[in-house]
Amino acid sequence: VSIGDRLALVLDPNDKKKATLVIDLEDLMGIWCYIVMPKLKDFANMSNKEQARKLAAMPDSVKQTYYIPREYGFWVKDNWMSQSVGYVREDAIVADASPVVYPPLGYFTAWHIWNGKFVIVSGTPYRNAKGEFMVKDLHNDTCDIAYLDEDSLVLSDGVTSRSYYKKNNINELNKKAQEIASRLSKQVLEENN
């Protein structure tokens, strides 16, 4: 904790001059990421044996092209705002041709601290009749901050925990995945012309 840092405190119910929990909000601000891997399309309908068989039959060049780890996460910003990070723009034709799918990326809009817990707000984006960007079906995900320092964060919901690492630059996220998506889109355009 440094002079000038914003803090969230949970006071001791028996002694209001003491805190049972101190969260340095300056450490919490930033871009927090974790790694996701794709799964075979229709993996939910396949047995583990069937998935292993399909993967073994897949050429290495296809695996190198499509089995690329991606960074997902959220950006904790000032004024209680948050933003999803990790989106990779793909051509619809390329996505349809891909043998894999990535987990859906949450759409985060806000955050706050409530009774010492980290709450992040997410929803479903859409465009209204006027073409304005809106968010519906907002819901709160509430987690304990199991660990926090300048570049590491662990959130826990009581059943599972997820570790995050901090990125300093939004433009560094998913560089390899972005390059491959761009290359595949160019290939599709060339093949269709």
Where are these regions (language model features)?
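Short nucleic-acid-contacting surface segments enriched for D/E, G, S/T with interspersed K/R
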Residues: 1-8
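Residue-level recognition of conserved beta-strand edge/terminus positions
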Residues: 10-12, 35, 156
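OB-fold/S1-family single-stranded nucleic acid-binding modules
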Residues: 12-26
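Short beta-strand element of the conserved SAM-dependent methyltransferase core
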Residues: 22, 75-76, 164-165
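Tryptophan-anchored aromatic micro-motifs
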Residues: 25-65, 184-192
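Edge beta-strand at a domain terminus
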Residues: 26-29, 102, 137-142, 147-193
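Contiguous, well-ordered beta-strand patches that form the walls/edges
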Residues: 37-46, 60-152, 156-160
